[in-house]
Structures are given as structure tokens and as C-alpha cells.
Amino acid sequence: DDLMGYLRQTMEIRALENNISTLLGRAVLKGASHLYAGEEAVAVGAIGALQSDDLITSTHRGHGHAHAHGDQAAKTDEEKQIHFNKMMAEVLGKSGGYCKGKGGSMHIADVAHGNLGATGIVGGNIPVAVGAALAQKLMKTDKVVLCFFGDGASNTGNFHEALNMASLWKLPVIFVVENNMYAMSVPWAKSSALPNVADRACAYGMPGEVVDGM
């Protein structure tokens, strides 16, 4: 059942992104919207490994994270539909959205269920995740924070500072780098001396693994 559910979520994210792309082409959506097509399995698999009360932070390319997290938090088909409607309403800037339409495509959040939100600032969510993990440690919960970001964000100061603090303070945070091999138009090989982002983990005394996200 879990595997079928993950497949369904993956297909729903792709369908969602295809529809958003169509709406963008028709100028129905206002402002920028960064699609997650091709990376669906990362969000579904990573979030599927969480407990129901764990937390996530997302990126400007966050539709997939929002759907996977909200769908897995929903217990019934009716709740799943309500989640989908609220997420789509948010993308469209409608008052029925998770953030009453004020967040839009790049700032979807559902704090009540553990989605601490997306951000339009590349790498801006990484220190937020570390702060949330510090809060969990201080409150002595058993919650984990899952932090998504791209390869471009791993070249920002936020990344290095946040990883150093997370390791130093032994915080319950998992960093998931969704490396699509390009930051804007710059290929990874021309922006990093190391072949894999995960190779940087050892500098902060933490494990780093490369996982096939396809």
C-alpha cells in the first residue's frame, strides 16, 4: 500500500506541475513559478521516511514537497482532497489557500502540520531548518527536520554556516540536496571543485551520501 501511495503521489506531482505550466502559459498565474517536474521521487521518498510529526523546510521549487508532505499527513481521501485544493488555491493566490493566497507559488507553508514553508531566497531555508532543529533539541522532542535545497544553495554562505552549527550542536536535521546539475545556467562542474555535494559533509563531521533521485 505504501509503495502504491508513493507512486500515486509521484504521478500527482507531475500532473500538478504540468497543469501549473499550462496555467503559466495562459498567464493565469501571476509572478514567477519554479516547477519540480523530474524531481518528484526525491520529495515523495524522503518525506515518506518521516514520522507524522516531523518537520520540513522547502525551496522556491517547492510544489512537490508541499504535496508529498500534505498528502502523507492526510488520513482520509477527503482530507487529501482538501489538502490538494488548499495547495492549488495558494499557488493561484486565492484566499482559500494555505497562506490565504499571500504566499503563492514560492512561499507555501502548512505550519500546523509541520511544513515550515518554502522561500524565494536560494538557501534561505537552510538556517531556518537548523533553528527549528535547535528548538526540537531544546524542547527534548524526538522530531526531525528535513531540509530540502538545490545544488546552487550549497554554494551559499548559509549552507556552510548552517551545516557547521548543526554538526557542532548535534541537531536533529537532515539536509537533502536536490542536485539537478544546474544553478540557473551554471553547470555543477563549473561551480564546485568537488564532484558531489555530499563530499562536503565530511568537512563538518557528518555523514554524506549520494542517492539516485530518479
Describe the residue ranges of each PLM region.
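Charged, compositionally biased N-terminal leader segments and the immediate start
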Residues: 1-3
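N-terminal glycine-rich anion-binding loops that anchor highly charged ligand groups
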Residues: 8-24
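Cofactor-binding active-site loop characterized by glycine-rich and histidine/acidic residues
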Residues: 18-21, 28-169, 187-193, 198, ...
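Short, ordered loop/turn segments at secondary-structure junctions
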Residues: 61, 178-181, 213-214
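Short loop or secondary-structure boundary microenvironments that flank
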Residues: 152, 212-213
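A positional/architectural concept
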Residues: 163, 173-175, 179
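A short acidic, helix-capping loop that chelates divalent metal ions and anchors anionic groups
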Residues: 183-185
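Structural signal for short hydrophobic segments within the conserved structured cores
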Residues: 207-211
